[in-house]
């Protein structure tokens, strides 16, 4: 490999904020934030909204709250058109 053109590969702590889970994965991600991990070492830190710990495909759980909001919004906007007219 050509020296000096590849990003640094290092362990990074990822934090899934939706379920408050932390995990360390090797990555080339660049971040200025750091966190001290359980082993006493300091690692780069990156927050995630969704990961395999919280995504419905991997957990088998559906997030009904968001879907209910969309259905209610649709019914509020277009519900009057579906009423039976005598």
UniProtKB/Swiss-Prot annotation:
- Parts forming coiled coils: none
Alphabetical list of Pfam families matching this protein: Ribosomal_L31 (PF01197)
Q: What keywords sit in the KW lines?
A: Ribonucleoprotein, Ribosomal protein
This protein's GO cellular component annotations are: ribonucleoprotein complex; ribosome
Q: Does the keyword Protein transport apply?
A: no
Mind telling me which InterPro entries this protein's record contains? Answer: Ribosomal_bL28/bL31-like_sf, Ribosomal_bL31, Ribosomal_bL31_B, Ribosomal_bL31_sf
Q: What are the GO MF terms of this UniProt record?
A: structural constituent of ribosome
List GO BP terms, alphabetically: translation
Report quaternary structure and partners: Part of the 50S ribosomal subunit.
Indicate the family of this protein.
Belongs to the bacterial ribosomal protein bL31 family. Type B subfamily.
Q: What is this protein called?
A: Large ribosomal subunit protein bL31B
Q: Which organism is it from?
A: Vibrio campbellii (strain ATCC BAA-1116)
- Origin organism lineage: Bacteria, Pseudomonadati, Pseudomonadota, Gammaproteobacteria, Vibrionales
The gene name on file is: rpmE2
């Amino acid at each position: 490999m050509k020296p000096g053109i590849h990003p640094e590969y290092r362990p990074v702590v990822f934090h899934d904020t939706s379920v408050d889970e932390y995990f360390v994965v090797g990555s080339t991600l660049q971040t200025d934030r750091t966190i001290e991990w359980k082993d006493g070492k300091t690692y780069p830190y990156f927050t995630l909204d969704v990961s395999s710990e919280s995504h419905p495909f991997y957990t088998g759980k559906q997030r009904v709250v968001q879907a209910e909001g969309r259905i209610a919004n649709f019914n509020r906007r277009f519900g009057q058109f579906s009423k039976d007219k005598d």
